[in-house]
Regions:
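Short, well-structured alpha-helical interface segments that form or flank functional binding sites
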Residues: 20, 39-42, 121, 125, ...
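Residue-level marker of regulatory loop/turn positions in helix-turn-helix DNA-binding domains and
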Residues: 3, 36, 176
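Short, charged/polar micro-motifs that form catalytic or ligand-binding hotspots
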Residues: 15, 116, 170, 174
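Short beta-edge/loop segments at beta->alpha junctions of small alpha/beta modules
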Residues: 13-90
């Protein structure tokens, strides 16, 4: 079978399934004659490069039809990043807004928080900087009790938290922000996300996979880093999401 024919058949197969592996498509195409797996792997790679397919895990593909998650950043958030970056240019950090989580929720909860995550050694310094320079109330490592008793999540404020090493990040307008995979794991683990845990978490993860491209390999690698890999796998299996 010519390469164009193989590629056409791959895309046809991809349109009938939400996700698939090399073995899946190899078994399907081999019904009309044996196809070399190396050739098939090469064609899959080319389709990924051409952005006709997405690789959403190790050896797991899907038709390119869902957007990537790109959190929006307000001018205020950009200014906060600039303040921190100018003061500590070598400090690794990540910044985003809680309002970006609302699209994933089933039961909407107000969240006007600006999250500033920095390397563990810099948390205190950045907290002190923002306490002095920002007009917003700034909290360091907030937990459930602090939020429940003292913080109105519907009002703008800043949470300063440690950034987990090797956390998956992306650049939004040259500003480091979390990937969707990072957020889905952090929601499970961080005490300030207590209100999104439990049954709501299932809705969030299900909506994330429905609305956006999610790299399950990246998700599970970070989940392992945070000690919640098995729990994440169990959730994916409960939602009938393919695990690589």
């Amino acid at each position: 079978m010519a390469n164009d024919g193989i590629r056409g058949n791959i895309l046809s197969y991809a349109s009938s399934d939400s996700s698939f592996t090399l073995s899946d498509v190899h078994s399907y195409l081999s019904r009309d004659g044996e196809i070399n797996r190396s050739t098939l792997r090469r064609q899959l790679s080319e389709l990924v490069k051409e952005r006709k397919l997405d690789r959403i895990g190790h050896g797991v593909y899907t038709l390119k039809k869902k957007p990537e998650f790109k959190p929006a950043l307000s001018e205020l958030t950009k200014n906060i990043f600039t303040q921190v970056h100018r003061a500590y240019p070598l400090l690794k950090l990540c910044i985003y807004e809680g309002v970006n989580l609302s699209q994933l929720q089933h039961h909407l909860s107000p969240n006007q928080i600006i999250y500033v995550e920095v390397e563990r050694d810099g948390v205190e310094s950045v907290f002190n900087l923002l306490t002095e320079c920002s007009k917003l109330k700034t909290y360091i490592r907030p937990n459930e009790e602090m939020i429940y008793n003292y913080i109105n999540m519907g009002e703008q404020a800043i949470f300063v938290k440690p950034l987990i090493t090797e956390a998956p990040l992306q650049m939004i307008e040259d500003i480091p922000s979390p990937t969707l995979e990072k957020l889905l794991v952090d929601i499970q683990r961080d005490p300030d996300f207590f209100y999104l845990q439990g049954h709501e978490l299932l809705y969030i993860i299900d909506n994330a996979f429905t609305l956006y491209t999610v790299n399950t390999t990246k998700l599970l690698r970070y989940a392992s880093r945070r000690g919640t890999k098995q729990e994440t796998i169990s959730i994916l299996e409960e939602l009938n999401i393919q695990v690589p």
